[in-house]
Amino acid sequence: MKAKTRQIRVGNVPVGGDAPCSVQSMCNTDTRDAGATLDQINALAAAGCEIVRCAVPDMAAAEALGAIKRQSPIPVIADIHFDYKLALKVLEGGIDGLRLNPGNIGERWKVEEVVAAARERLVPIRIGVNAGSLEKELLQKYGHPTAEAMVESALGHVRILEELGYDQIKISLKASDVPKTVAAYRLLAQRIDYPLHIGITEAGTMFSGTIKSAVGLGILLADGIGDTLRVSLTGDPVDEVRVGFEILKALNLRQKGINLVSCPTCGRCQINLIGVAEEVEKRLAGIDAHLTVAVMGCVVNGPGEAREADVGIAGGRGEGLLFRNGEIVRKVPEADMADALIAEVEKILAEKH
């Protein structure tokens, strides 16, 4: 069961409460290049990204972000560190959310100015604790970046905002170490009811980063922890969105795109199942429909899996049986399997509309 958290809104996207876990990403373009950043945001939105974050290293980036926000199809969050003037500038430009740790931007009056501007516009603030940048006093107290140190850091930042009467807050606790991240979120979830942004930071490249993120986020989501997520990968941010939705789909928390089931193959397989499955996956990638498609290689599990799917192929010697809703449609030669599956999917979609 999902943990009950308060609900905030990032632009038009609800986060927390009964809202489904949303999928975020972060642009890796230079924010000062508004054209390139908007191109990437549009690509992310096309992949299903619901919230996007942009780095704001200087005033030129803050000014560009205003124009980016006005043309973005999805809510935009500004990632701010140290300089409160950058936060004020992006708030003035209509930003949908801030990622900002109030303890890192100097004197209290600076925090008060940022909070006043955020309150005026109902802009939420994400407190983002990272194991790699904990306060020196916490490192001295705990010896190294422990889960407890991360939680104490987060609560310290929360306290600053609460003292100023601001509760439009969400929190993240990220480390590249999966068990540490999981432990930190579990501890924090027992202490507060603010919505939680979950992620494994610096997770790695597409292969290793996907695995780390799937394990860490999967554990948290199965525990009911997580109101919005970002999969951090070294590479194209569009892949972060795809992986994020696949993690949610695997736990039946979100449905986006077609669910492809395919067997790993073994010595009984007598067709080029890998080639068929890869072609089917590629051709179905742009279809956002709640369907299960099975590509199975032999008579052991194939017919059963194919029958359970909306559409499926169960392979034999150079051919296979095409199933739809548990019923055999026809026998299909191996060379035509991908085309037959795609055609059947298109037929179902046409009938639904």
Swiss-Prot record:
Q: Which GO biological process entries does UniProt record here?
A: isopentenyl diphosphate biosynthetic process, methylerythritol 4-phosphate pathway; terpenoid biosynthetic process
Pathway the protein acts in: Isoprenoid biosynthesis; isopentenyl diphosphate biosynthesis via DXP pathway; isopentenyl diphosphate from 1-deoxy-D-xylulose 5-phosphate: step 5/6
What's the record's note on cofactor binding?
Answer: Binds 1 [4Fe-4S] cluster.
Q: Which domain of life is it from?
A: Bacteria
Note the PANTHER family from the entry: 4-HYDROXY-3-METHYLBUT-2-EN-1-YL DIPHOSPHATE SYNTHASE, 4-HYDROXY-3-METHYLBUT-2-EN-1-YL DIPHOSPHATE SYNTHASE (FERREDOXIN), CHLOROPLASTIC
Q: Which residues bind [4Fe-4S] cluster?
A: 263, 266, 298, 305
What taxonomic ancestry is recorded? Answer: Bacteria, Pseudomonadati, Thermodesulfobacteriota, Desulfuromonadia, Geobacterales
Identify the EC number(s): 1.17.7.3
- Can you say what this protein is called? 4-hydroxy-3-methylbut-2-en-1-yl diphosphate synthase (flavodoxin)
- Which coenzymes or cofactors are required? [4Fe-4S] cluster
Give one Pfam family.
GcpE
Q: What Gene3D superfamilies does the record tag this protein with?
A: Dihydropteroate synthase-like, Sulfite Reductase Hemoprotein, domain 1
Q: Which GO terms describe its molecular function?
A: 4 iron, 4 sulfur cluster binding; 4-hydroxy-3-methylbut-2-en-1-yl diphosphate synthase activity (ferredoxin); 4-hydroxy-3-methylbut-2-enyl-diphosphate synthase activity (flavodoxin); iron ion binding
Origin species: Geobacter sulfurreducens (strain ATCC 51573 / DSM 12127 / PCA)
InterPro entries for the chain: Dihydropteroate_synth-like_sf, IspG_bac, IspG_bac-typ, NO2/SO3_Rdtase_4Fe4S_sf, RibuloseP-bd_barrel
Q: Is Oxidoreductase one of the keywords UniProt gives this record? A: yes
Write out the function statement from the record.
Converts 2C-methyl-D-erythritol 2,4-cyclodiphosphate (ME-2,4cPP) into 1-hydroxy-2-methyl-2-(E)-butenyl 4-diphosphate.
Q: Which UniProt keywords apply?
A: 4Fe-4S, Iron, Iron-sulfur, Isoprene biosynthesis, Metal-binding, Oxidoreductase
Reaction catalysed by this chain?
(2E)-4-hydroxy-3-methylbut-2-enyl diphosphate + oxidized [flavodoxin] + H2O + 2 H(+) = 2-C-methyl-D-erythritol 2,4-cyclic diphosphate + reduced [flavodoxin]
Can you tell me which family this protein belongs to?
Belongs to the IspG family.
